[in-house]
């Protein structure tokens, strides 16, 4: 009999026999999308959740290790807390793309649970493990401090509705981004949908000698595996010049670490990841260019053959 792992998610007891990253269970099985998958390796903080009240990254915690724990995502926070953060982050302009915001809110709430009146330095320290690529953190810290004030006073200010040119207004999407129900591409789920992913180069510059897809294609649940030879006609893309290959084919040279050499389509995420590992790519590693000085040196490898102005 398979081992069962039981824990509570937002007040509901959940049981699974799968030992996998808790983030994948939350997103794939429960379709809780406030916890974002920004890195899958505990670096960015977009998947931060509460585990027994502490801020924890869900991508590095497994369902086995979560057994017996109380897990809370943004969706499970009390309504007054969510409303306080929605108002505060909207009032100070803390939300831009919004991808990092649910994780920021969770980290901030963990701070306020033990320190309801934090200093600016304490608020900044609380989100030290949460990366934001948009705001520079200043407005997020402003929002945390305002949310703390609102929660201490127990009253959310009324929003000004008589807007005029030049008035400060809240973003119309601030509520969905703070509370995590706004959908990004990775949050979209349709019954029966397939999952796609790229097999990427292990080297910044290398010639692709051989791509073997047979083992991946034979894995149950795999729909198809595509390489450059499956693209009819022009395969280069680009905004100004079409100088970026969609896929690097056999005999061609990669331009950077992570260049795509194959695409895999599967019935589920787990099968997709297994299939990607079964695609065998043989490379001839070539000298790479790591900076402008190397690139401009006599005899430097030519990364792109097109001339850029």
Predicted features and spans:
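Flexible, low-hydrophobicity surface segments
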Residues: 148-305
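Signature of N-terminal electron-transfer/Fe-S-associated modules in redox systems
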Residues: 1-160, 164
């Amino acid at each position: 009999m398979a081992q069962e792992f039981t824990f509570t998610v937002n007040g509901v007891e959940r049981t699974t026999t799968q030992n996998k990253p808790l983030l994948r269970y939350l997103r794939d099985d429960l379709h809780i999308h406030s916890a974002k998958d920004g890195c899958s390796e505990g670096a960015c903080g977009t998947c931060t959740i509460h585990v027994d009240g502490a801020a924890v990254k869900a991508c590095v915690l497994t369902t086995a290790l979560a057994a017996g724990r109380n897990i809370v995502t943004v969706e499970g926070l009390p309504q007054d807390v969510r409303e306080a953060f929605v108002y505060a982050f909207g009032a100070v302009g803390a939300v831009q793309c919004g991808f990092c915001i649910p994780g920021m809110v969770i980290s901030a709430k963990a701070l306020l649970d033990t320190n309801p009146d934090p200093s600016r330095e304490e608020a900044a320290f609380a989100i030290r493990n949460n990366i934001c690529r948009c705001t520079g953190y200043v407005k997020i810290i402003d929002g945390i401090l305002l949310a703390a004030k609102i929660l201490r006073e127990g009253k959310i200010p009324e929003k000004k509705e008589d807007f005029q040119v030049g008035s400060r207004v809240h973003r119309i999407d601030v509520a969905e981004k703070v509370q995590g129900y706004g959908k990004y591409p990775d949050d979209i789920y349709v019954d029966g949908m397939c999952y796609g992913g790229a097999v990427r180069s292990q080297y910044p510059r290398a010639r692709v000698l051989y791509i073997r897809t047979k083992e991946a294609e034979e894995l149950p649940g795999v729909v198809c595996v595509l390489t450059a030879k499956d693209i009819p006609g022009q395969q280069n893309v680009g905004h100004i010049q079409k100088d970026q290959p969609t896929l690097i084919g056999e005999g061609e040279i990669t331009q950077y670490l992570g260049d795509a050499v194959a695409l895999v389509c599967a019935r589920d995420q787990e099968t997709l990841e297994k299939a990607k590992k079964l695609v065998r790519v043989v490379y001839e590693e070539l000298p790479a260019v790591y900076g402008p000085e190397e690139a401009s040196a006599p005899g430097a490898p030519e990364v792109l053959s097109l001339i850029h102005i």
